[in-house]
Amino acid sequence: MDSKIDSKTFRVVMLPWLAYSHISRFLVFAKRLTNHNFHIYICSSQTNMQYLKNNLTSQYSKSIQLIELNLPSSSELPLQYHTTHGLPPHLTKTLSDDYQKSGPDFETILIKLNPHLVIYDFNQLWAPEVASTLHIPSIQLLSGCVALYALDAHLYTKPLDENLAKFPFPEIYPKNRDIPKGGSKYIERFVDCMRRSCEIILVRSTMELEGKYIDYLSKTLGKKVLPVGPLVQEASLLQDDHIWIMKWLDKKEESSVVFVCFGSEYILSDNEIEDIAYGLELSQVSFVWAIRAKTSALNGFIDRVGDKGLVIDKWVPQANILSHSSTGGFISHCGWSSTMESIRYGVPIIAMPMQFDQPYNARLMETVGAGIEVGRDGEGRLKREEIAAVVRKVVVEDSGESIREKAKELGEIMKKNMEAEVDGIVIENLVKLCEMNN
């Protein structure tokens, strides 16, 4: 334990998954907790340390400390791949498997730091197990769509004959995709992680957006489920090499541009790139497209659209683009972080979910009336003409006015959640758990 920390301060160890998006939301929550007499330790791999340092200002140098977590060494997974950022897709399972073996090093960290509380992520069954052996309370911070967590908990806790037929919110079932069945080992492990959470579960959402799903998850698991808000990074001071993007947007009319981005981890296929490019060109709507790498699939497209669009093959300041007055729509894979940012800035979503929880996030956005999912053909390929039609409806046409208004309404609610302090009930429950181990 650091002797410089005030004895009246509660020490909390946070353990996010090894993805930048997960680390980012834990870091936002950590910063908010430091205003309430909590000292935070954030554990991650050595490879992620520089990202964390880049996102920590001197303001938090005394209240948030970074702790390296050592993953087992492996010739198949060298040190530079101890992160999902830039991880080749075929190594995703290897990283997850190696991460599950980090328990012994995590135990050493906990013994040294002697925290009052551990806050862990979605896939770390070993973390609450290690904390329990040391008599340290641990809770889970779930950073995705609560509607999906409610479905998972339902599938695992109800008898098989009561599974989907009795789930009260069928509106979140994804389009043209298989629904998970009860008995899935992945769901079982995931729900076990939730059940290990001591008394409460924190969720990255709001009652206004997912109140009925939050209540159902709480009832199903028999635990308090407490929303902590969107936990998104605010638009930041721009670097010189990004100012030109804002100047380009400044020349466009209000709410006339669609932003296109599929996150830092999903790699679009050439077919997907061609379909999206065709749809954008057909829509005749201005766009900013952040793509991981330009390919031959874009040959001719960039010249044809001219000043109508930007195609950028490097990192872009997503929050700044979404918050710009010219941005009127967001073509997104519907990762939860991107979904939260879109809602935060009142921008309606043109949803193109690709994997994982994204189809459920897309359905939620349709259900609340702040987005439309683009349809696919019988082989799962995006419909080019429908891309154009949905973009025009969401950004331009009168028929999309209700969607635009709903997105703005949710944006105002999220803004208030961002500006407010952490909910008093959340702090009260965290203090109670810390005092159990004081």
From Swiss-Prot:
As its record notes, the protein acts as a catalyst of: cyanidin 3-O-beta-D-glucoside + UDP-alpha-D-glucuronate = cyanidin 3-O-(2-O-beta-D-glucuronosyl)-beta-D-glucoside + UDP + H(+)
Compartments where found? Cytoplasm
Q: What is the effect of changing R25S?
A: Decreased activity with UDP-GlcUA as donor but no changes of the affinity. Increased activity with UDP-Glc as donor
Sorted keywords for this record are:
Cytoplasm, Glycosyltransferase, Transferase
Instruction: Specify the superkingdom.
Output: Eukaryota
Work out whether the entry's keyword set contains Hydrolase: no
Regulation of activity: what does the record state?
Answer: Inhibited by copper, mercury, UDP, UTP and partially by calcium, cadmium, iron and UMP. Not affected by cobalt, magnesium, manganese, zinc, nickel, tin, uridine, sadium malonate and glucose.
Among InterPro entries, the record links this protein to: UDP_glucos_trans, UDP_glycos_trans_CS
Is the Glycosyltransferase keyword given for this protein? yes
> Its Enzyme Commission number?
2.4.1.254
Q: Under which main EC class is this enzyme filed?
A: transferase
Tissue-level expression reads:
Expressed in petals. Not detected in sepals, stems, leaves, tubular corollas and white petals.
Relate the protein's function as given in its record.
Answer: Involved in the production of glucuronosylated anthocyanins that are the origin of the red coloration of flowers.
| Protein name, entry field | Cyanidin-3-O-glucoside 2-O-glucuronosyltransferase
Gene behind this protein: UGAT
